[in-house]
A protein has these predicted regions:
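Aromatic/basic-lined ligand-recognition segments
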Residues: 164-170
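Charge-rich, well-structured scaffold segments of protease-associated domains
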Residues: 1-158, 175-183, 188-194, 199, ...
């Protein structure tokens, strides 16, 4: 997405001109590809006897981005939660794969995908829509032949049984203790289904919101690691949502014990339930967050656009994701049934076979390789 906003008409139109030109008519010179993508240079400038190495702005940025354990943790478990769809891949580019990209492949990808037939235009504010549409038509749409292929992200093929994976990350330290991450992830329903999205958000909030929440409390009080994983929570930006929880500061051999701790905690929620006051408080917080204007540090218009964009991207109804009142009323009724958490945890998590236990352990030799 390429968002911009301005309260000044002239500034807005100037930005629109620049964005339309940059997105649909990029020059993409080969020298720019070498600078921004990848190239081979001597490691010491001017020293022809120094070793050759890969360089490039994006290449170096992604090396930096993927140097953190949390980034590798997120990419690692995502690749197993989404084994066959586009979410399997690192959207910024895997540094190890960037050097295989050719200039011709980049041009082909750009011409195929950065095309008005694939574009979604969303606007908010007191705009002259006819004037705006005419600008889009004359400066972009009319200058291309329509493509008839629709690009879709298909639903992920579901596992028939849970899986466990262990991988390693580089850590430059002689002491590798208390540096392992264990995370469990589940693939849930469609993010374009507002009822399913709100239900999953409420379940996640009740389980993980604070130290009194059952799953967060179990992870915080466990001696299997130092603290809950930063990945704990619900991810709803992909076509299908995912729920994750886990622990950091652990040891590789604790993987099965962490998994059992999480499953036992979820089973206790199903068996014993959760205080209705906790559910009501979480629902109230969820409702406030959903209705909050500017609560995500964006202008209100961009906030609405980002909320509805997943439905537009996946050929759903963008307006439906903004019609909160009926969905919140349905959730309020369901959440007050007395068995909301039991039913939801059982259905979305315990009965869900598309589950991954992912362990990321330190290795002091990887960085040298």
């Amino acid at each position: 997405a390429y968002p911009f906003a301005s309260q000044n008409d002239k500034d807005f139109n100037n930005l629109l001109d620049v964005y339309l030109d940059a997105v649909f008519f990029s020059r993409l010179h080969e020298l720019d590809f070498a600078q921004e993508g990848h190239r081979i240079e001597f490691s010491e400038e001017g020293n022809v006897d120094s070793p050759l190495e890969y360089k490039g702005v994006v290449f170096n940025e992604m090396k930096g981005a993927m140097s953190s354990a949390v980034s590798q943790l997120w990419q690692g478990i995502s690749s197993y939660l989404f084994p066959t769809t586009t979410y399997h891949y690192n959207s910024g580019g895997d540094p190890a794969a960037i050097t295989d990209l050719s200039y011709e492949q980049l041009l082909s990808f750009y011409k195929t995908h950065y095309h008005p037939s694939n574009a979604i235009f969303m606007t908010f504010g007191a705009l002259d829509i006819s004037e705006l549409h005419n600008k889009l038509e004359t400066q972009a749409l009319s200058r291309f032949e329509r493509q008839h292929k629709q690009w879709r992200v298909e639903p992920e093929k579901r596992y028939t049984a849970p899986m466990a994976v262990e991988q390693a990350y580089g850590l430059d330290s002689e002491d590798l203790s208390a540096a392992t991450h264990h995370v469990m992830g589940w693939l849930l329903g469609e993010s374009t289904d507002l009822d399913a999205q709100l239900e999953a958000h409420l379940m996640s909030q009740v389980l993980l919101d604070n130290s009194a929440s059952p799953l967060r409390r179990a992870l915080e009080q466990s001696d299997l690691g130092s603290s809950p994983s930063p990945l704990c929570g619900l991810e709803d930006s992909n076509r299908e949502m995912s729920f994750m929880c886990g622990i950091e500061g652990s040891e590789p051999e604790h993987a099965a014990a962490v998994e059992q701790l999480i499953l036992d905690t979820l089973e206790s929620v199903v068996r014993d339930g959760v205080d209705q006051a906790m559910i009501d408080a979480s629902l109230h917080q969820l409702e406030l967050h959903q209705r909050e204007i500017g609560g995500d540090h964006y202008p209100y218009g961009l906030q609405l656009i980002f909320n509805s964009l997943p439905a537009a991207t996946h050929y759903g109804d963008p307006a439906a994701l903004l019609n909160l009142d009926p969905a919140l009323e349905r959730l309020r009724e369901t959440a007050g049934s007395g068995t909301f958490m039991q039913d939801t945890v059982q259905r979305l998590l315990l009965n869900n076979r598309h589950r991954v236990r992912y362990t990321l352990k330190p290795d002091d030799g990887i960085n040298e390789e």
